[in-house]
Regions:
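Flexible C-terminal active-site loop/helix
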Residues: 83-157
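Catalytic core of soluble alpha/beta enzymes
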Residues: 1-88, 114
Length: 157
């Protein structure tokens, strides 16, 4: 699998595997910024595999729509993550645990980047295996005091 990063739309016409004369599946990552990008890439045969990230897709609802489109069009997907808090890591872990990912995600322990993360229990890997809690919501408790301490801007709806 070859992962292409930040391949702008104006270059997408160069992505067709037939033109490259390679058999390696093309995985798009940062190039897919939402459902419309994914739909375009599928329609024009520019994608073999998708690396999906909730934040890049625009939230959980568009991510769900993208996963459903991948399933309908038989495009394998896998779940990636970035430097992010345990809340986002747990969301990505829950998505990766759906069971039909193409391959293991590039997830890491939730306490990897922050000395005091926002969730309990931490998302951890033991011997390469991720334990995903099955409680309500994401299955973890959010430390409200830590969230408040890290908050830069707050909006009340």
């Amino acid at each position: 699998i070859t992962t292409l990063q930040t391949y702008k739309e104006w270059k997408w016409e160069h992505l067709n595997n037939d033109d490259w004369h390679i058999e390696t599946p093309i995985c798009l990552d940062e190039s897919i910024l939402g459902y419309d990008d994914l739909s375009y890439a599928i329609e024009y045969g520019l994608i073999d595999v998708l690396n999906i990230k909730v934040g890049r897709m625009g939230g959980l609802v568009p991510t769900k729509a993208a996963i459903n489109l991948c399933r309908e069009c038989h495009i394998p997907y896998w779940v990636g993550s970035m430097v992010e808090s345990g809340i986002s890591k747990m969301l990505h872990a829950q998505l990766a645990a759906l069971g039909d990912s193409y391959m293991a995600g590039d997830l890491s322990d939730s306490n990897r980047y922050f000395e005091r993360d926002l969730i309990y229990p931490d998302l951890t890997f033991k011997d390469g295996v991720m334990h995903v809690p099955d409680g309500d919501g994401l299955g973890v408790t959010v430390f409200d005091d830590r969230l408040e301490a890290y908050c830069v801007e707050k909006r009340t709806l």
